[in-house]
Swiss-Prot record:
CDD domains: Ribosomal_L1 (cd00403). One of its GO terms (cellular component) is large ribosomal subunit. Binds directly to 23S rRNA. The L1 stalk is quite mobile in the ribosome, and is involved in E site tRNA release. Protein L1 is also a translational repressor protein, it controls the translation of the L11 operon by binding to its mRNA. Disulfide bonds: none annotated. Coiled coil: none annotated. Belongs to the universal ribosomal protein uL1 family. Keywords: Repressor, Ribonucleoprotein, Ribosomal protein, RNA-binding, rRNA-binding, Translation regulation, tRNA-binding. One of its GO terms (biological process) is regulation of translation. It holds the Pfam family Ribosomal_L1. HAMAP family: Ribosomal_uL1_B (MF_01318_B). Part of the 50S ribosomal subunit. This is Large ribosomal subunit protein uL1. NCBIfam families: rplA_bact.
Length: 239
């Protein structure tokens, strides 16, 4: 995706791509409603693409007091099937299973992780298991799967954590250059559902503004669809 242009087509050649270029303007900024409409009209892929958001923040992630990270419960969900693992002691395993966890256990899951068998998208753990999980932190950490109390994945509330993970909880984290990227639902969702997800996500990131940030916090917002167009949002329209 281009950092400076508000329209980018992530493929080359073909009649459909040329048609997509016509449906979005390279010299325009859009509000969220119009942006969603434009992306839908310009989508040409044969699968159901994901609505993606990229936010450029005026922060320096190298400073610990300017890290932006958290989770958002999307009102309309993500449209994806999420596999959840719960690492807990035996007496709470049945509770985790009833809650809907796909993988439940303790040392057996740790052994699978060490063997490279990671068959889950979210890992939840009870606090009393964190010492054991520490042995696989170097494996889970780089994959964004390490349980974290700040993200609600280290908790005594197994039922609530599993429900949140299954119903559309999305994690966000500012990367290099202050960029946040996330998928916020399928393009086939009704417009109003996508707008609810967008507003919930943007609001959460805005509220997560570090106190030490000087100057403009929101620098730019882009929306795109998988293998489709990218449009830039008019920041004044969401202020």
């Amino acid at each position: 995706m281009s950092n400076n242009k508000d329209v980018a087509i992530k493929s080359s050649g073909g009649k459909k791509i040329r048609e997509a270029r016509i449906k979005v303007r390279s010299d325009s900024l859009y509000n969220l409603t119009t942006a969603v409409e434009k992306l839908k009209s310009a989508s040409y892929v044969k699968f159901d693409p994901t609505l993606e958001i990229v936010m450029k923040l005026g922060i320096d992630p190298r400073h610990s007091d300017q890290m932006v990270r958290g989770v958002v419960n999307l009102p309309a969900g993500t449209g994806k099937t999420v596999r959840v693992a719960v690492i807990c002691k035996e007496e709470r395993e049945e509770e985790a299973k009833v809650a809907g966890a796909d993988l439940v256990g303790s040392t057996n899951i740790i052994d699978e992780i060490k063997a490279g068998k990671i068959n889950f998208d979210v890992c939840i753990a009870t606090p009393d298991m964190m010492a054991v999980i520490g042995s696989v932190a170097r494996i889970l950490g780089p994959k964004g799967l390490m349980p974290n109390p700040k993200l609600g994945t280290v908790t005594l509330d197994i039922k609530g954590a599993v429900k949140n993970a299954k119903s559309g909880q999305v994690e966000y984290r500012a990367e290099k250059a202050g960029i946040i990227h996330a998928g916020l639902g399928k393009l086939s969702f009704p417009d109003q559902d996508l707008l609810k997800n967008l507003k919930a996500f943007i609001d959460a990131v805005v509220k997560a503004k570090p106190t030490g940030v000087k100057g403009s916090y929101l620098k730019a917002i882009y929306l795109s669809s998988t293998m489709g167009a990218s449009v830039q949002i008019d920041l004044a329209s969401i202020a």
